[in-house]
Curated annotation (Swiss-Prot):
Origin species: Homo sapiens (Human)
Domain uDENN, residue spans: 43-214
Compartments, record wording: Recycling endosome; Cytoplasm
Main localization category: other
Protein's name in the database: Protein DENND6B
Name of the gene: DENND6B
């Protein structure tokens, strides 16, 4: 294995570094720098161990030039270990999400923008948070004073590829726990040879003698997910392991105990309501939170969410304060102490140990928040919220029939995912249609005038439009759709959706204006214009061209070439001194 990993030329690079004190901030990397390809997938790899004197301690960070603040190190240490209530023995995989200290980073190269412009909004890189994907091992070991070997291998990334990174950890971690540092360095070197994440393309990712084949969804894909097509297999030895999805969880397994409350939970997610998820272990907690936040796809989940959260987190006080309304966050925890601390929260979901028996597990009950007890709270959804829409009984019957017929879990998950997707689309399509009607007509966009403005969004006008163009056209669910839209208008998700759509429409308007300029006769326009007006046009065209070349404006390559030709034509008509200013040697 080591010989296989060590073949081929390798750039000089840093050694595995102990996690000593560092200043905050990130070491900027250019695309040609060492670890640039690695950084397209991962920020760093961490190893967290248990020290008898220090407790959880960061043993190493790799690459060793990646800088974490002391607060980030502390968060990674606590979030990478199950708390004492979980009692996880053996190997456990889970994930967490933590805030980056110091706010959003500046992208160190254009690949971030390039990737985000092509990826579905739900799979875009996180600008201000890290995902941590954890493989934790706790086994008896008589050679250790405490009597147990306790260590976590953590992949830190800005990409929400939970399935991919869990699969990667299941390959790397067992080998690492046996061979330690040399194995990890070789793996990181392999990842540094991977192609960049490219939405819409099938990628072959070699690691530890295995080729993992994945396809990252593209923004232009049809809604229904499909596994990557296998091709070029004859040139790949060994044959690749095809990962059906980089991000989709087994929804049916996650939601088995709460299927009767899916409608209520979907509405709580849509409205961005604060929700505490109390689970018996970090793997159950993190999967439930990630499953809940995926319910709104293809909408971006605009609220905060923490798949696994502990009382040691630096944001503990922020989330548990009673001096203001609970924040819009989905919080996954395993410590029952949170029941007491957060009993003022409006919605609390308590789930038990997962049971994968043949029958559908006992469904958690809907209970009033006043029924909350402290540490011995029974499984249930504790909320006073009443769903606006009736639940889909036909879906429940289909899923129950699937359980009786021993239908595979992935097929059950596909049924559930399709239901949630169609529900979200039925809700959002009327909003999309109304928003599109606010766009100025193309014939009103003329080359030499400022483009007309997008009309303002009127909630009353939209609600009136639902009578003839509402969700009832595509969804059979009955209920108070109007009431749901009214509450949605007050939620972070409406604000996030509206800002994103308005931004896209403004860019489209700008692109149409650029096309109108490029299709006009510029020489006729210049005849009666002053030099100041001509120079102003050059500067504005250049600005639009830069934005378009940076993939910010949706324009065709032919339009870009025509715009460049226009700029050259206009500059050529100016006196030599102005030409020298606009085109310095």
């Amino acid at each position: 294995m080591d010989a296989l990993l060590g073949t081929g030329p390798r750039r000089a690079r840093g050694c595995l570094g102990a996690a000593g004190p560092t200043s905050s901030g990130r070491a900027a990397r250019t695309p040609a720098a060492p670890w640039a390809r690695f950084s397209a997938w991962l920020e760093c790899v961490c190893v967290v161990t248990f020290d008898l004197e220090l407790g959880q301690a960061l043993e190493l960070v790799y690459p060793n030039d990646f800088r974490l603040t002391d607060k980030e190190k502390s968060s990674i240490c606590y979030l990478s270990f199950p708390d004492s209530h979980s009692g996880c023995l053996g190997d456990t995989q889970f994930s967490f999400r933590m805030r980056q200290c110091g706010g959003q980073r500046s992208p160190w190269h254009a690949d971030d923008r390039h990737y985000n412009s092509r990826a579905p909004v739900a799979l875009q890189r996180e600008p201000a948070h890290y995902f941590g994907y954890v493989y934790f091992r706790q086994v008896k070991d008589s050679s250790v004073k405490r009597g147990y070997f306790q260590k976590s291998l953590v992949l830190v990334s800005r990409l929400p590829f939970v399935r991919l990174f869990q699969a990667l950890l299941s390959l790397i971690a067992p080998e690492y726990f046996d061979k330690l540092a040399p194995c990890l360095e070789a793996v990181c070197s392999e990842i540094d040879q991977w192609p960049a994440p490219a939405p819409g393309q099938t990628l072959n990712l070699p690691v530890m003698g295995v080729v993992v084949q994945v396809r990252i969804p593209s923004r232009v894909d049809k809604s229904e997910s499909s596994p990557p097509k296998q091709f070029d297999q004859e040139n790949l030895l060994p044959a690749p392991v095809v990962l059906a999805s980089v991000h989709e969880l087994d929804l049916f397994r996650c939601f088995r105990p709460v299927l009767t409350h899916m409608q209520t939970l979907w509405e709580l997610m849509l409205l961005g309501e604060p929700l505490l998820v109390l689970a018996p272990s970090p793997d159950v907690s993190s999967e439930m939170v990630l499953a809940l936040t995926s319910c709104l796809q293809p909408l971006r989940f605009c609220c905060d969410f923490r798949p696994y959260f502990t009382i040691h987190d630096s944001e503990f006080k922020e989330f548990t304060t009673r001096t203001q309304a609970p924040p819009n966050v989905v919080l996954g925890v395993t410590n029952p102490f949170f029941i007491k601390t957060l009993q003022h929260w409006p919605h609390i979901l308590r789930v038990g140990e997962p049971k994968m028996s043949g029958d559908l597990p006992k469904q958690v009950k809907l209970k009033k928040p006043s029924r909350l007890k402290t540490l011995d709270t029974k499984p249930g959804l504790y909320t006073a919220y009443t769903a606006h829409l009736h639940r889909d009984k036909a879906l429940l019957k289909r899923l129950l029939k699937g359980v009786q017929k021993k239908r595979p879990s992935d097929v059950q998950s596909a049924l559930l995912r399709r239901h949630l997707l169609e529900l979200t689309q039925s809700f959002i399509i009327p909003l999309e249609h109304y928003m599109a009607s606010l766009m100025p007509l193309q014939k009103s966009i003329t080359p030499w005038k400022t483009p007309p403005q997008i009309q303002p969004f009127s909630q009353d006008d939209f609600l009136r439009s639902l009578e003839h163009a509402g969700p009832q056209l595509t969804c059979i669910l009955k209920g108070d759709w109007l009431g749901l839209y009214r509450r949605f208008f007050k939620s972070p998700h409406f604000d996030g959706w509206y800002r994103q759509r308005h931004k896209e429409m403004a860019l489209k308007l700008e692109a149409l204006h650029l096309e109108a300029i490029c299709e006009a006769n510029i020489e006729t326009w210049m005849k009666d214009k002053s030099e100041v007006e001509v120079v102003d046009l050059v500067l504005k065209l250049r600005e639009k061209l830069v934005r378009a070349q940076g993939h910010q404006l949706p324009v065709k390559e032919a339009t870009l070439q025509r715009a460049q030709l226009y700029i050259e034509t206009v500059i050529g008509s100016l006196p030599k001194d102005l030409q020298a200013v606009l085109c310095p040697p």
